[in-house]
């Protein structure tokens, strides 16, 4: 039996369901500690029709490669706030175990890694004889599912921005260690006074493992974005190189805002604007992390870890800003060349 792509709670609120593939529940239901239920649809799913019916057969095939074509929910682009309690009247079920931040980050990292492996490299796609450039322009989009890749990229970038906001504060508020609990103990004649704590020195106050997971997700996302940027530059180069009277059959991904479908000639511009905006948000998240690390660098319990994390953050921030700059210049160049509206 087919089930909705969104859980009942997200469906009723008309929100995109942020459930990661392989996870038993979505992050909204996990945060609210309520049941995440997927019911049959009220009417059959209907795959979206491709924009260019005459010559987009390969794009239509790739768009429906994973079953139902589910596009990115643009109305829910940056909806990162907490959701309200479950509406009354819904069936009550025992809530599934709430995923930890580490589980959600690990699932996101695995999804990004699979995406990177699925996108052909520059060596595989961007080397072609000049004599075959025209034929190559008509088939360049058949090497991978561009629509699905971009939809997933936007989903994962939004999820990472949300997880940054949760994981960074949690990394600086680790649970109290045994030695610290002994020092804070107010129980009269407590037995802890007759035993030796496992650690004679306080454990680090920074959760280095959790921070490394966050940064690993961001690095892998940048790997995917850099690969797609190379693909975009190759397409732009072909447009500028081919004869003026030749219109290559590039498969422009479909952009939907509610029931509105953006025209093909403006869809690419909208897509680039959203990618740049999401990268801007992620750069700001790294800067927030740097500021928080700087606040604890003089704490004796976090000094060494803070130095390592600060260096990692600096490297990540430099690369994130570089990737953001590349996408911004790419978009501006296309606008200047009147290839985008």
UniProtKB/Swiss-Prot annotation:
PROSITE patterns, A to Z: ZN2_CY6_FUNGAL_1, ZN2_CY6_FUNGAL_2
Biological processes, Gene Ontology terms: positive regulation of DNA-templated transcription
Any one GO MF annotation of this record: zinc ion binding
Localisation per UniProt entry: Nucleus
Domain of life: Eukaryota
DNA-binding region: 7-36
Coiled-coil regions listed in the entry: none
Annotated GO CC locations: nucleus
Keyword Cell division applies: no
InterPro entries in alphabetical order: AtrR-like, Zn2-C6_fun-type_DNA-bd_sf, Zn2Cys6_DnaBD
Protein name: Transcription factor ACEII
UniProt organism field: Hypocrea jecorina
Gene: ace2
